[in-house]
């Protein structure tokens, strides 16, 4: 729905419209508090409207981008206001240098330091990587980034994006999040239908080639169509 997506343009338009109506009583419009308050209002709106237990909000871009500064400030304020009811999960990249045959954690360390410099301490780190990370690397990242060891999980390259939730479950990401939120940890979910889908995907034997004519070169522009076709194919023994 409309409440599930938030753009910078929509945030600024909403603030400008409020200023034109006189909602701010003639005050000078500032990034803090007016823009940040509007960002927080939009984030909270989804949970208040539909009474969700959890609301997941993604802040796109890269730490340090000037465009994301108001959003990061809003997130910092929300953590301060909500305490344990909000956690910050940071997705970061651990590159593999093929020539040297080693994984480098410096980009992750610097990324976290950038976050800390604006007042945000990640509660959980998800390390995006091409190669498997051993415990020594995870311990190093945990120590340098002030994050609990069991809250440093890896997201390595997998055959299918649908394998990722199983990988996260096996590493205990769900339990780490529940602990950080002070929630009770129940039985481990079986994810039967999800595993059945993955099994069907691996065992699909027939191939079908579908041409999609579109306006844009970027594949993600048609992500929902591509994934819809993929899922329909899996349930009909096609890949």
Name every feature range the model reports, one short phrase each.
Residues 1-238:
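Flexible phosphate-sensing "switch/lid" loops adjacent to ATP/NTP-binding sites
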């Amino acid at each position: 729905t409309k409440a599930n997506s938030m753009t910078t343009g929509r945030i600024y338009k909403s603030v400008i419209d409020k200023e034109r109506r006189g909602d701010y009583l003639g005050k000078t419009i500032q990034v803090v508090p007016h823009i940040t308050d509007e960002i927080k209002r939009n984030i909270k709106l989804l949970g208040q409207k539909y009474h969700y237990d959890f609301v997941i909000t993604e802040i796109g871009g890269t730490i340090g981008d000037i465009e994301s500064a108001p959003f990061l400030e809003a997130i910092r304020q929300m953590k301060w206001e909500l305490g344990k009811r909000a956690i910050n999960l940071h997705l970061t990249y651990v590159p593999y240098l093929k020539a040297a045959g080693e994984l480098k954690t410096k980009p992750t360390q610097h990324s976290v330091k950038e976050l800390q410099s604006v007042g945000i301490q990640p509660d959980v780190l998800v390390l995006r990587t091409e190669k498997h990370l051993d415990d020594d690397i995870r311990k190093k990242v945990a120590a340098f980034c002030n994050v609990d060891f069991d809250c440093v999980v890896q997201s390595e390259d997998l055959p299918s994006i649908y394998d990722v939730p199983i990988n996260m479950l096996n590493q205990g990401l769900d339990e780490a999040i529940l602990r950080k939120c002070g929630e009770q940890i129940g039985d481990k979910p079986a994810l039967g239908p999800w595993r059945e889908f993955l099994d069907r995907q691996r065992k699909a034997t027939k191939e079908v080639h579908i041409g999609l004519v579109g306006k844009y070169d970027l594949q993600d522009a048609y992500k929902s169509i591509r994934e819809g076709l993929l899922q329909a194919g899996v349930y009909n023994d096609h890949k």
